[in-house]
A protein has these predicted regions:
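Short, surface-exposed coil-to-beta transition loops
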Residues: 210-212, 224-225, 321-326, 338, ...
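Bacterial N-terminal signal peptides
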Residues: 7-16
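Short, hydrophobic/aromatic-rich segments at coil-to-beta transitions
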Residues: 194-200, 226, 305-313, 336-340, ...
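Non-transmembrane domains of secretory- and envelope-associated proteins
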Residues: 22-120, 235, 246-299, 304-308, ...
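Extended serine/threonine-enriched, polar tracts that run as long, contiguous segments within proteins
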Residues: 304, 309-320, 324-336, 343-345
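Loop-centered beta-sheet repeat module
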Residues: 209-267
Length: 416
């Protein structure tokens, strides 16, 4: 049945690609953003309440990547199954896709041309050579909201014992380009400077790192490198720094580009779209902060559910990159990467990144939100036997920030 469903989905995508170029049809919008409106995926062996564990792993063989299934089989973690959650993104984003996607193209250097807002390429033909690159651009421009503010604790967690490192921080991502208008308000205030988004990070504890801050500008043109600044209490100065995406953060082993599944430059990888699968995924949890358990308390153990997923493989172009490839499993409805498999230079499965997105109806203050609501992250390193984990205390979406929030002098003022 799974092969039949995936065949239908792929066939519909290919058929639509061949027959619709001038406009994005209601059928395509329905397929891309409302795949569960008419019927939710189901399997008799995976009824809600079923537990997937080392004793029952065989019933999930067709619904998990082998690398994750092996961890369940080994007893590293277990989870229950829940009914699939319908989580459409914002109406403004969907409308922007419908209105503008037909004019989006790839330039000779792989940049977007004609992009305004919404999902750049709702039509993906697995047979097309550039389908992988298009999927990577969809990942870049998934509906992240205009502003996300997160109060969280970053932990470096070994297999046993207390965390090796624990950092409380305040983290903000705000977009200033290519966001759809909502209620007549234009959030695109950084178009003049070509800044797609700004990212701010402020350490609150421990004492020896308190008030250390960083600011990043990600430019809309992928060929342009990020600009980064840091502030440290010891210097009381803001310094411009170079941050390599292949570098690690806080001795965690995880690369800067690993967060959110992939947070790097599209240009740094060769991309291949591997197709559509129906898989179990940790999406739609009815909590405000993800629950972790299993080995090292590294794994997401809130209920998982059947989702239609797109599989995207990225191969680093740099010969000295720490990875040989990354494979992202993207939720079709939201284009959020739910789990990402990372392979070392010898081709061994080295890390798994879990990004968890919950049901906004169970997230106080975010009940109205129609973007993927982030509830936690775990980057498990099987070679170092630790995990880089983000434990969320509070998250807010689309709450406006002062115009000067990201000014460099504000970093100095906050550090006083």
């Amino acid at each position: 049945m799974q092969q039949r469903l995936c065949g239908i989905l792929c066939g519909l995508v290919c058929l639509t690609w061949q027959t619709v170029r001038a406009e994005i049809s209601a059928e395509v919008i329905q397929q891309r953003f409302y795949p569960y409106a008419a019927e939710k995926p189901a399997a008799a062996e995976l009824a809600p309440g079923t537990t997937i564990s080392k004793d029952t792993w065989e019933i999930a063989k067709a619904y998990l990547p082998p690398e994750i299934l092996d961890k369940v089989k080994a007893g590293e973690f277990a989870f229950a199954v829940q009914e699939t959650t319908d989580l459409p993104v914002s109406a403004a984003y969907i409308e922007a896709t419908k209105k503008h996607a037909d004019q989006v193209k790839l330039s000779a250097e792989g940049e977007l041309e004609g992009y305004v807002a919404g999902l750049p390429f709702p039509l993906l033909d697995p047979a097309e050579p550039q389908a992988g690159l298009k999927a990577a651009w969809n990942l870049r421009y998934r509906d992240f909201g205009d502003v996300m503010q997160v109060w969280n604790t970053f932990r470096l967690v070994p297999e046993t014992g207390s965390p090796d490192r624990e950092i409380e921080n305040y983290y903000v991502v705000a977009y200033g380009m290519h966001r759809p208008l909502t209620d007549g308000v234009n959030p695109n205030k950084w178009e003049k400077d070509g800044v797609l988004y700004k990212e701010f990070y402020h350490i609150l504890t421990p004492f020896d790192l308190k008030n250390t801050m960083s600011l990043k500008h990600r430019y809309v043109r992928d060929q342009a490198n990020d600009d980064n600044w840091t502030y440290t209490p010891a210097s009381r100065k803001v310094r411009k720094v170079i941050v390599r995406h292949e570098d690690t953060l806080y001795d965690s082993g995880a690369l800067n580009e690993d967060y959110f599944g992939f947070w790097g430059y599209v240009r740094s990888y060769s991309w291949k779209f591997l197709g559509v699968q129906r898989l179990l995924a940790p999406v739609g949890a009815r909590v405000a902060s993800a629950t972790f358990g299993g080995r090292g308390h590294w794994y997401p153990v809130d209920p998982w559910e059947l989702r239609v997923m797109l599989v995207l493989e990225g191969t680093p172009k740099a010969s000295d990159h720490p990875y040989s490839k990354r494979v992202l499993y993207l939720d079709q409805q939201t284009f959020a990467p739910v789990y990402t498999l990372l392979y070392d230079r010898q081709g061994r499965h080295q890390r798994t990144v879990f990004d968890l997105y919950g049901n906004p109806q169970f997230n106080p203050g975010n009940e109205h939100v129609r973007v993927p609501v982030w509830i936690g992250e775990s980057i498990i390193d099987y070679e170092s036997k630790n995990a880089s984990m983000t434990i969320i205390t509070k998250i807010l979406y689309n709450v406006p920030l002062p115009d000067d929030f990201f000014n460099l002098d504000k970093m100095v003022a906050r550090g006083q």
